[in-house]
Each structure stands twice: as C-alpha cells, then as structure tokens.
Amino acid sequence: VLLKMKEIADAYLGKKVTDVVITVPAYFNDSQRQATKDAGVIAGLNVLRIINEPNAAAIAYGLDKKVEKEKNVLIFDLGGGTFDVSILAIEDGIFEVKSTAGDTHLGGEDF
C-alpha cells in the first residue's frame, strides 16, 4: 500500500517523494507502528514520524495555529470502521499527547 501511495505521490508532484509522515489508528501498538515504519523503508521512504490519526486531524484543522495559550483538546476521529480519541495539550504549536484510545469495533459505518 505504501509503495502504491509513493508512486501516486511521485506522479502527482512530478518528483520523487522520500521523506514522509505516516498516520496510523490510535489503537496501534508499538509493534504495529514499527511494522508500518518498516513497510515504509521497504517502499523506499524515509519515515520521519508515525502519528495517530486524531493528532493528524488536529494538525490538519490548524489547531496548532488557532490556540493562543495552553489548551487541552479532545479530538474525535470517527472513521469508517474505527473510533479514535486523543486528549492533547497544545501550546506554542507543540502538541503533547496526554491520552489516546481507539475502538476497532465502533465507527462511522455503525451509525
């Protein structure tokens, strides 16, 4: 999957993609995260970081730029087949993960 995504990104950008950040479900354990990172290396990618999908959603939404003083934020990531939440402390553009959890048996398809 990562190799195919790399090929799509290379074609879309018109240049080789090497450095990547990969998102994973919040419930992934350390061995699943390492396997994802290893798959990235096999696909010829330099995996800079593995981050939880709820954290990626917070960054994409721009919370790092909208928060002026330290705030605790609860992020819901209601995917098609999973439900992830993270509690983040955000200050000066820095995200500190306080807690994260997920449920593989509850997601958007269940609603």
From Swiss-Prot:
Signal sequence interval, chain numbering: none
Gene3D superfamilies: 3.30.420.40
One GO MF term attached to the UniProt entry: ATP-dependent protein folding chaperone
Keywords: ATP-binding, Nucleotide-binding, Stress response
Short name of one Pfam family: HSP70
SUPFAM superfamilies, A to Z: Actin-like ATPase domain (SSF53067)
The keyword Nucleotide-binding appears for this protein: yes
Family to which the UniProt record says this protein belongs: Belongs to the heat shock protein 70 family.
Record's protein name: Heat shock 70 kDa protein
Species for this entry: Hydra oligactis (Brown hydra)
